[in-house]
Amino acid sequence: MTTGPFVPNPTIDPKSLGKVGVLMGGRSAEREISLMSGNGVLAALRARGVDAHAFDPGLQAVADLAKQGFDRVVISLHGRFGEDGTIQGLLEQFGIPYTGSGVLASALAMDKEATKRQWQTHGLPTPDFVMLHAGADWQAVADRLGLPLIVKPAREGSSIGLTKVTSVAELPAAYEKAARLDRDVMAEQFIEGDELTCPIIGEGESATALPLIRIVAPQANYDYQNKYFTDDTRYECPAPIPADVAARVQALVVQAYRGLGCRGWGRADIMLRKSDNAPFLLEMNTSPGMTGHSLVPMGARAAGISYEDFVLQLAASASLELHASTDWKPE
C-alpha cells in the first residue's frame, strides 16, 4: 500500500480527453453542494483547455450523454443517485467512462452499515453501532454504545440528518429526524478525540493517501452548516499529530479504501481517540466535495498538487469496470 507523495501525470493532453461531461446537481439532498463542486470542476477543466460541459442528471436523461457524444464524464454528484452505484451502473450500460469507484464499491460506501460490516470483515477498526427502528429499546441502545452517541441516516452524506445525542430522552427525536431521510437509521458509538479526514487517489496497490487534515469545528459540531457555509471551522493540513501516528492512520485509510474496492479517488473520515491515539474509521466518500471549503483539494495542495492539476488527472482517470463483448450471439 502506498502513502508516499503523488506526482500527477504532466503529459496529459487536454484534447485527448475528448468531450467531457461534468455531472452535477442530481436529485439528492446534497444537490446544492454538488452544483458548487461541479461548477468548480467545470471551470478547472475549461481553464486547462478541456472541452467540458455541465450535465445535470436531475434535469436531463442520462441517455442524452450518449446521444450528445460525450467521451467521458467526471462525476461531481453527491449522495443518492450519484454516489451510490446507480449512475455508475447506467454509465456502464451506455459505455461511457466515468471517474471514481464502480457500481459495487459506490453502493457499499454509500451504505454506512454495509461499509462498517465490510471493514469489520477485514479486521479494521470502526466504532460500534446499532441499527435503529421505531420500537427500539432506547435504554438498551445507550447501554451498549454509551453516551454521548451519534444517530444518522445510513445513506446520506454531508452530516445531513445527523444528531449527537447526550441523553436517552433525546434518542426518539434523533431517530425520527434521521428516519425522515432514510428508512435505515444507525446509532454509532461516539469516539472522543480529533476528527480527521484523508483523501486517497489511485487504485489497488497504487492507491495513495494524501496528507491528513484535522477538522476543528465550532463546539466540535461539524454539521452541514459548518461544513459548507461558515468560515468558523478550522482545517489544519497537514494534521498536527505525531508523524508515526499520521503514517499509521494513512496506512489504515488505504486498507479501508482497498477493502471496499474503491478506485479513482475518495476520502475517508476518521476519529483519533484522545486517550490512546487509536484511529477509528467512520465513513468512505467515493465522490467527495470539490467546493471552496472541500477537503480533497486542501489535501492535494498540501501534497503540491494544484486544484486544476488534480481535476485534470481525475478526468484522465475515467474508465469502465465492465467491457461488454461485441462477439456474443444468442444460441
UniProtKB/Swiss-Prot annotation:
HAMAP family reported in the protein's UniProt record: Dala_Dala_lig
One Pfam entry name: Dala_Dala_lig_N
Subcellular localization(s) per the UniProt record: Cytoplasm
Keyword tRNA-binding recorded: no
Family in the record: Belongs to the D-alanine--D-alanine ligase family.
Cofactor(s) this protein requires: Mg(2+); Mn(2+)
Enzyme class at the top of the EC tree: ligase
Associated pathway: Cell wall biogenesis; peptidoglycan biosynthesis
InterPro entries: ATP-grasp, ATP_grasp_subdomain_1, D-Ala_lig_Van_CS, D_ala_D_ala, Dala_Dala_lig_C, Dala_Dala_lig_N, PreATP-grasp_dom_sf
Note describing how the cofactor binds: Binds 2 magnesium or manganese ions per subunit.
PROSITE patterns per UniProt: ATP_GRASP (PS50975), DALA_DALA_LIGASE_1 (PS00843), DALA_DALA_LIGASE_2 (PS00844)
An annotated GO BP: cell wall organization
Protein name, UniProt field: D-alanine--D-alanine ligase
Binding positions (ATP): 142-197
Chain residues that bind Mg(2+) 1: D269, E283
Top-level taxon in the UniProt lineage: Bacteria
Keyword list, A-Z: ATP-binding, Cell shape, Cell wall biogenesis/degradation, Cytoplasm, Ligase, Magnesium, Manganese, Metal-binding, Nucleotide-binding, Peptidoglycan synthesis
All copies of domain ATP-grasp, residue ranges: 116-316
Name of the encoding gene: ddl
Gene Ontology MF term list: ATP binding; D-alanine-D-alanine ligase activity; metal ion binding
GO-annotated cellular components: cytosol
Catalytic activity, reaction form: 2 D-alanine + ATP = D-alanyl-D-alanine + ADP + phosphate + H(+)
Main function: Cell wall formation.
EC number in record: 6.3.2.4
Positions annotated to bind Mg(2+) 2: E283, N285
